Amino acid sequence: MIFLKIFMPMLTAHTIKILQSLDKKKFRQKYNLFLVEGDKIIRELKNSSYKVQEIFSTDISNPDFQSFKTNLITERELRKISLLQNPKNSIAVCELRENTSIEAPIQLVLDNVQDPGNLGTIIRLADWFGIEQIVCSEDCVDFYKPKVIQATMGSFTRVNVIYKDIAALLQNSDRPVFGTDMVGQSLYKTDFPERFYLILGNEGNGIRPEIKKLVSQNITIPRFGKLQHTESLNVSMAAGIILGQIFSKK
C-alpha cells in the first residue's frame, strides 16, 4: 500500500499571488521558484536534481507523488494558480537550479532565441540525441518560463541549460565552432569532430555579426525543392535536421 504525505492547505490570497507571479522572470528569480504543470512532466522530477518544495493536485492517488509533500486542492483553486490556458490537474513548485556549467562533448549554443516553443523543442531534441548541455546567450528567453517547460515535455530535467556571455565562452575555447547560416558548407558534406559547439541563431536575424566572427565553419541545410521559395527554416526544425545528420554518422 502506498502512503502519500497529503495536506489540506489553506491557499491564502498571498500564496496564490506568489504562485501567479511566477509567470514572470523577475518573480521567479525573486522567490527562486518555478512551476511545473501536469502529472507526466512532474513524474520526470522524481529522478532529477531539481528540488520540489510541494505539489498542489486535485488527484491525490498518483503514486509518483509519494516522495513529495502533496496538497489536495479543488478545481477552482487549481484554476487560480495555474499559469496555463488549459490547466493540468497537478502543479509542482520547484526551486531554480544553479547556473553551473558541466563538461559535455557536444554543446548547443543559442544566440538570442526568443520563442518559448523553439527553446522547449530544442531542449527536447538535445535530450533525444543525448546532448547534455545547452548554452544560452543572456538575452535568450528564460527556460523556466511556463511555455518553455511545457514544450520540453520533461526533457529539461535531463539537459543542463545555462546562461552566459557566449562571445566570451567561444573566444576562450579551443573547440571548433559551427554556425548555422543560409550560406555555408552543406551540412551533408561536413564532418564533425567529437567535441564542438553548434550555434543556432535568433528566429528573425540569425547569428549576430559579433558572434559570427567566432565561427570556425558555417554550415547550411541545402534546399532541394524545385522552386526554392522557402526563405528559411524554423530554428528548432533546423536543429532537428542538423542533429539527425550529425548522429547518423555515429
Question: Language-model features: where?
Answer:
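Boundary-proximal intrinsically disordered activation/regulatory segments immediately upstream
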Residues: 3-58, 141
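Amphipathic alpha-helical repeat scaffolds
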Residues: 38, 114-122, 230-236
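RNA substrate-binding interface of SAM-dependent RNA methyltransferases
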Residues: 47, 101-185
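Active-site regions of enzymes building and remodeling cell-envelope glycoconjugates
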Residues: 65-76, 105-106, 177, 191-197, ...
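Glycine/small-residue-rich loop that forms an oxyanion/phosphate-binding "nest" at active or ligand-binding sites
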Residues: 72-94
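Short beta->alpha connector loops at strand-helix junctions that form conserved
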Residues: 73-74, 111, 137-138, 160, ...
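Structured adenosyl-cofactor binding patch, chiefly the S-adenosyl-L-methionine
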Residues: 128-129, 143, 148-157, 209-250
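Active-site/ligand-binding-proximal alpha/beta "capping" segment
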Residues: 179-229
